[in-house]
Regions:
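Acidic/polar loop-and-plug regions of large Gram-negative outer-membrane beta-barrel proteins
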Residues: 251-255, 268-338, 351-384, 427-453, ...
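Acidic, small-polar-rich N-terminal luminal/periplasmic segments of exported/outer-membrane proteins
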Residues: 64-211, 562, 732
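Conserved C-terminal beta-signal and adjacent last beta-strands/turns
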Residues: 6, 406, 528, 560, ...
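Structural signature of Gram-negative outer-membrane beta-barrels, strongest in the C-terminal barrel
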Residues: 384, 403-415, 453-582, 606, ...
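Gram-negative outer-membrane beta-barrel transporters
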Residues: 474, 579, 599-685
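Outer-membrane beta-barrel translocator/receptor signature
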Residues: 172-175, 185-269, 273-279, 329, ...
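Membrane-embedded beta-barrel scaffold of Gram-negative outer-membrane proteins
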Residues: 334-338, 344-350, 354-360, 527, ...
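Surface-exposed extracellular loop regions of Gram-negative outer-membrane beta-barrel proteins
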Residues: 290-302, 414-418, 513, 517-561, ...
Length: 751
């Protein structure tokens, strides 16, 4: 396939072979360990007694049954759907949700395993405040939180930006997927791509726990995607100070969309060490993902006034020669050291190297009745080299009746992006409903070096932060105040000709934060925050501009939020009300001589309410989900033409509900169900066409039982059980179709 280097094909094959070898090795190791345990002499109480020959004791059926039951109880508890209130809050560290003035929750690795999630977007289908769409013209996942996007470049790992695979992400390497609703410039700094204004996603690597684990999983999804994973964790040394966690996962095959194939390989090695004062972890990872013949998003021609009907749920209107192949090597080092019981120093350093290639084709519908469309072809290689770091100090002390937690530190990110392209000069005819296979067009219009792309941008982000969280009245009231100084240095280059620098941006900003938490009772809290989002300002560009080249300071988005939380440990609920105002830009006529002016006077104001409920409602009955309402209002638009209209692709409401029910008459059996409901979405800023409301139902079951004194869990599920055809998203002005009915099966056993 064009653009896929032989070395990358070799890496992919090596990853698959490594998976098989690791599986065989661990199975052999487990069998050997079991044999050694069975033949090893039993320990005695005294040295004298050691000379007495011990007679092996055979366990009675009752004892074996009791052991099996204990294993099953543990396995069933581990399989339960769990969403944790709280998570890692950047500058503030890891906190319980009840104690912070922000709305944050964490989806665990057990949930990821039980739902057979293969991408980050599939994990976030559980969240009522998140909707997923594709990137512009490709198959990357973009997440929409509170009406604003989070690009893959702006997803963090353990609070570090710039080290995450940016298009598609394999979730099997992570212990938690954490979602923060709301702006986060103080907490995490400015995101490198300028998104994450309405929310932030943070991933936490798996590390070895005190209980050893050797977990083997096999997966299947229709129409023919097969895969599996191996998760091994051990602690060793004195006081179990050393830990090692190894993860291998992969899949390959045709999805439930006609002629679409996906493949992935993920390898992770996580090492950690600790003593009484110091904690060190090192995480190293490789990931490959790819899509062949993927179903793309759908653009609408300028003359289209209505939304075309939705094609058959499994119909693929893409071309089979399209593909992407994404390779990433990434990792990080974390260090914490307690100077005393009141003062902790910490630091982290991470890096990413990526090599992406793809041949893309996105169709544009020109007749919504017949589905007549045109499409083009473009090959794009893209590479990144990123480095990211942070460091700081966290201190606790008292001043009279007031307890203080001081957080101070800084962060830095260096990012270089390189790209090129080749494209077909003319488009070809196609159809949304009756799509014929078309030979790949000749792509003879080239920009840049396809084999060794030149830099298109170099980004340097530096920041310093300080905050003080003051607690009063035995912790019943906590007030957080702080700020982050952010500097942005961004250079643009002509990657398509001589590589010369074409733009220079160097600006800074200070973003404050104020947060208040009041605990009326031990299990409840009321909170408020005022925090900002931050993104690069623009430089005036265009034709006949009177302010051509004017550089604008960074965009500051302002959020106000108030809410309430209830947390019993097994059950949590959060109710939040918020407003986020984000500036934007436009060009409008200036005078009567054909001149224009570039302004940053526009505004998008998103107001909304969020309700989330997680945990055990009744014994054996668990629920995770909630609902959101949002009003995404456009204000101060160019010449006032769209004032009061709703922003494109933001539904007026969303509902998600996940339910688990343990069958009382069959121990170990659990029924699972999920519903997703998404409200009306406008397709254009004129608000003349919109997507209808859509609803999707998923059903499934799992059963845990013992085989040879080992727990085995079988799972079966059906996503979109009614095979509903629907347009899932209109974000950014293009349509994304929902997935067809998909059957899933998996097994997991602890060896």
């Amino acid at each position: 396939m064009r653009g896929r280097l032989p070395v990358l094909r070799s890496l992919h094959r090596v990853g698959r072979v490594a998976f098989l070898l690791a599986t065989v090795a661990v199975l052999n190791d487990a069998a050997f360990a079991a044999q050694q345990e069975a033949t090893a002499p039993q320990k005695t109480v005294t040295d004298k007694a050691a000379t007495v020959k011990k007679v092996p004791q055979t366990e009675t059926p009752t004892t074996e049954a009791r052991k099996d039951e204990n294993l099953l109880v543990t396995a069933r508890r581990r399989n339960q759907m769990e969403v944790i209130s709280g998570g890692q809050l950047g500058a503030l560290g890891t906190k319980k949700g009840l104690d912070v003035p922000f709305n944050i929750r964490s989806y665990t690795s057990s949930l990821i395993l039980n739902q057979q999630s293969q991408t980050l977007g599939e994990v976030l289908e559980n969240d009522p405040s998140v909707r997923t769409t594709y990137g512009y013209g490709n198959f990357s996942e973009i997440f929409v939180i509170r009406g604003f996007p989070v690009y893959g470049d702006d997803v963090a790992i353990n609070g570090l930006y710039g080290i995450t695979p940016r298009q598609l992400l394999s979730p099997q390497l992570y212990d938690q997927v954490q979602v923060l609703n709301g702006a986060s410039a103080f907490l995490n700094g400015a995101a490198p791509s300028g998104t994450a204004i309405g929310g932030n996603i943070n991933l936490m690597f798996k590390h070895a726990q005190n209980t050893p684990i050797t977990r083997l999983t096999g997966d299947y999804a229709s129409q023919g995607v097969g895969g599996g994973s191996l998760d091994v964790g051990r602690r060793f040394g004195q006081d179990k100070a050393y830990g090692l966690r190894l993860n291998v996962a992969g899949l390959d095959g045709q999805t439930s969309i006609d002629h679409e194939r996906r493949h992935s390989v993920a390898l992770g090695a996580d090492f950690d060490w600790h003593d009484d004062k110091t904690r060190i972890s090192l995480d190293m990872n490789y990931q490959n993902q790819g899509v062949n013949g993927g179903r793309p998003g759908v653009f609408l021609g300028t003359d289209i006034t209505g939304v075309p009907r939705v094609p058959n749920a499994s119909h693929n209107y893409g071309q089979r020669w399209t593909y992407n192949d994404l390779n990433y090597i990434f990792g990080m080092l974390n260090i914490e050291h307690d100077l005393s019981k009141h003062v902790t120093l910490y630091g982290a350093f991470g890096g990413l190297g990526s090599d992406e290639k793809g041949n893309y084709s996105t169709l544009t519908v020109n007749n919504s009745q017949t589905g007549a469309a045109t499409a083009g072809a473009m090959y794009v290689p893209y590479a990144q080299t990123n480095e990211s770091t942070r460091g700081g100090v966290r201190a606790h002390f008292d001043t009279g009746p007031v307890k203080h937690e001081i957080n101070a530190g800084g962060s830095a990110l260096w990012e270089e992006s390189r790209t090129a392209y080749s494209m077909a000069l003319s488009s070809f005819d196609t159809n949304l409903y009756n799509t014929a296979a078309v030979p790949a067009p000749t792509e003879n219009w080239t920009g840049g070096n396809l084999d060794n792309p030149l830099p298109t941008s170099r980004t340097q982000l530096y920041s310093l932060f300080f905050s003080d969280t003051m607690s009063f009245w035995k912790g019943r009231v906590a007030l957080t105040a702080g700020f982050r100084y952010q500097n942005m240095l961004i250079n643009g280059y002509d990657a398509y000709t001589d590589g010369s620098r074409t733009s220079h941006y160097s600006e800074d900003a200070i973003t404050p934060v104020v947060g208040l938490v009041v605990h009326p009772t031990r299990r409840t809290s009321i909170y408020f925050n005022r925090i900002e989002g931050l993104s690069q300002g623009l430089t005036a560009s265009g034709t006949n501009l009177v302010n051509l080249g004017q550089i604008f300071p960074p965009f500051k988005s302002v959020q106000y939020e108030i809410g309430a939380k209830y947390d019993t440990g097994r059950f949590t609920t959060t109710l939040a009300f918020y407003q986020i105002s984000q500036p934007n830009s436009y060009t409008e006529p200036y005078g009567n001589n054909g001149s224009f002016i570039f302004r940053e006077n526009g505004l998008q104001r998103n107001r909304g309410a969020e309700l989330s409920v997680n945990g055990q409602i009744l014994p054996g009955l668990r629920f995770n989900g909630g609902a959101t309402l949002i009003d995404a209002d456009l204000r101060r638009t160019a010449q006032g033409l769209d004032n009061g209209h709703t922003a494109i692709g933001i539904p007026n409401y969303t509902i998600n509900g996940n339910l688990e029910y343990d069958l009382p008459f069959l121990r170990g059996a659990t029924l699972v169900g999920r519903v997703e409901n998404t409200g009306k979405q406008w397709v254009n800023t004129a608000n003349t066409a919109h997507l209808p409301v859509w609803t999707r139902f998923d059903l499934g079951a799992r059963y845990t039982f013992a085989v040879a004194h080992k727990p085995l869990t079988l799972r079966f599920g059906v996503d979109n059980i009614a095979n509903t055809r629907y347009w899932a998203s209109a974000f950014n002005g293009y349509l994304l179709q929902g997935l067809p009915r998909t059957f899933k099966f998996s097994f997991t056993t602890d060896l």
